[in-house]
C-alpha cells in the first residue's frame, strides 16, 4: 500500500526544523592549495594595490626610495612583457617593440594576404605587437628564426608563407629610427647646464670609456649628488658627435631627467642596443 498524500506532504514540506542543519547555508572554508597557495603553484607574485602610495609610506613609516625621480627606477617599473628570443619576461622599456603591418610589394601597394614584422620605437595599441631583446648582436644571431617573433595570435591564424621579416634591413631600420628621433630632439632641446639636480650628461668621448656611467659630483654647497653620463662617442655617429660637442664650455649637453624623459629613454635604448654582450 502506498502512503496517502497527506503523509507525503508531512514528510516533504512539514519537516520539523530540528532535523535541518542550521550550518548548511554557511560557505565551506577554502582548503584546496589551488586557492590558498595560488601565488605559489601558479608562479605569480601576489599583487598589492594602493590608492595612494605616498600616503601608505607616511602612515606605516616605510622607507621611500623616490623611484619616481630615478631614471633607472622608471625603466624597471615599466610593465613586464614576454620576450620572443629568450622566452622570458622583462621590463618593456628594455625591449624592442615589434609591430605587425601589411606587407608592401614592389608596386608599393599593401598585400592584405601578407604580414610584415617591423621594429618600432614605442609600443602602440593600434597594432598587434611583440618584443625582442634590445641588443643588436643577439638580434643578428637570431634573425634566421625571425618569423617566430610574430605574436601568437598571428602565428595561429596565418600560414608561414604569408609572414615576412626583412632580415637585411631589420637592424639598420631600427637603428636609423632611433638616431633620427635623437637628432631631431637634441637639435631643439635646451642645455639645462649643471644646475639641475636630477640630470643626465651627454658627452662624446671616443676613448675606451663605458657607454653609461654613474658619477658622484658636488652640487650647490658642496653636497654630493649622482649624475648619469651617456657617452655618445660609443655610437660613432658624426652628426650626434657634432651636436653634443658644439658647446665648448660645458663639453657636453645636460638633460633634465624629469622634463626630458622620452629623449633620455631613447638614448638609453640606443646605447643598450649597441652595447657588447
Swiss-Prot record:
Record organism: Saccharomyces cerevisiae (strain YJM789) (Baker's yeast)
Protein name as catalogued: Required for respiratory growth protein 8, mitochondrial
Coiled coil: none
GO BP annotations, alphabetical order: mitochondrial genome maintenance
Highest rank taxon of the organism: Eukaryota
Cellular component per GO, a single term: mitochondrion
Stated role: Required for respiratory activity and maintenance and expression of the mitochondrial genome.
Subcellular location: Mitochondrion
The encoding gene: RRG8
Family recorded in the similarity comment: Belongs to the RRG8 family.
Signal sequence region: none
Keywords: Mitochondrion
Amino acid at each position: 500500500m502506498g502512503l496517502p498524500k497527506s503523509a507525503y506532504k508531512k514528510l516533504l514540506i512539514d519537516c520539523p526544523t530540528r532535523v535541518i542543519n542550521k550550518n548548511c547555508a554557511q560557505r565551506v572554508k577554502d582548503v584546496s592549495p589551488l586557492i590558498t597557495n595560488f601565488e605559489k603553484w601558479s608562479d605569480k607574485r601576489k599583487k598589492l594595490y594602493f590608492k595612494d602610495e605616498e600616503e601608505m609610506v607616511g602612515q606605516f613609516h616605510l622607507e621611500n626610495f623616490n623611484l619616481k625621480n630615478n631614471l633607472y627606477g622608471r625603466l624597471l617599473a615599466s610593465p613586464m612583457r614576454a620576450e620572443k628570443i629568450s622566452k622570458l619576461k622583462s621590463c618593456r622599456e628594455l625591449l624592442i617593440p615589434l609591430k605587425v603591418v601589411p606587407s608592401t610589394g614592389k608596386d608599393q601597394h599593401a598585400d592584405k594576404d601578407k604580414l610584415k614584422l617591423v621594429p618600432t620605437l614605442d609600443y602602440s595599441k593600434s597594432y598587434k605587437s611583440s618584443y625582442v631583446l634590445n641588443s643588436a648582436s643577439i638580434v643578428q644571431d637570431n634573425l634566421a628564426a625571425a618569423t617566430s617573433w610574430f605574436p601568437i595570435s598571428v602565428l595561429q591564424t596565418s600560414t608561414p608563407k604569408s609572414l615576412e621579416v626583412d632580415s637585411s634591413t631589420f637592424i639598420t631600420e631600427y637603428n636609423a629610427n632611433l638616431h633620427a628621433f635623437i637628432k631631431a630632439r637634441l637639435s631643439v632641446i635646451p642645455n639645462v647646464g649643471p644646475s639641475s639636480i636630477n640630470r643626465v650628461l651627454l658627452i662624446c668621448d671616443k676613448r675606451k670609456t663605458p657607454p653609461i656611467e654613474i658619477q658622484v659630483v658636488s652640487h650647490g654647497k658642496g653636497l654630493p649628488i649622482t649624475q648619469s653620463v651617456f657617452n655618445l662617442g660609443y655610437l660613432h655617429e658624426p652628426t650626434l658627435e657634432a651636436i653634443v660637442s658644439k658647446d665648448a664650455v660645458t663639453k657636453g649637453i645636460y638633460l633634465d631627467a624629469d622634463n626630458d624623459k622620452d629623449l633620455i629613454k631613447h638614448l638609453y635604448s640606443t646605447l643598450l642596443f649597441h652595447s657588447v654582450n
